[in-house]
Design a protein with these regions (language model features):
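Glycosyltransferase specificity loop/lid
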Residues: 1-95
Length: 95
C-alpha cells in the first residue's frame, strides 16, 4: 500500500508521528512523507521517502504550498494521512 503522510513544520506535530510511520513501513507500506524542504533529516529517521515543498512563516501559506505539492503526486497513493491543521487534506483525499 502506498501512503502519503502530510504534515506541517512543527516539531510537536511531526515527532509524535515518526513511530506511526515506522510501524506502517514495518507492516509493508511504502510511505512518502510530505514536509517542507529542510526537514529531510527528521523524515529520514522514520525511513519514509521524502517529498518536499517550500516552507513559509505564515500557516496559510504553508497549507497552500503543501496542498500544491500534494496535488502533484496524490494519484500515486492508496491512502493519505494528514495532520489536523491541514484542513485541505479531506478535499485532497476525495479527489
Amino acid at each position: 500500500m502506498q501512503v502519503l503522510f502530510i504534515n506541517l513544520p512543527y516539531y510537536g506535530h511531526v515527532v509524535p508521528t515518526i513511530g506511526l510511520v515506522q510501524e506502517l513501513i514495518a507492516q509493508g507500506c511504502e510511505v512518502t512523507y510530505l514536509m517542507p524542504f529542510g526537514w529531510e533529516d527528521i523524515v529520514a529517521e522514520s525511513k519514509a521517502q521524502f517529498a518536499g515543498y517550500q516552507n513559509h512563516k505564515q500557516l496559510s501559506e504553508q497549507i497552500k504550498n503543501a496542498y500544491a505539492a500534494a496535488e502533484q503526486i496524490v494519484e500515486r497513493f492508496d491512502m493519505i494521512i494528514y495532520e489536523q491543521f491541514f484542513f485541505l487534506g479531506k478535499h485532497l483525499a476525495e479527489q
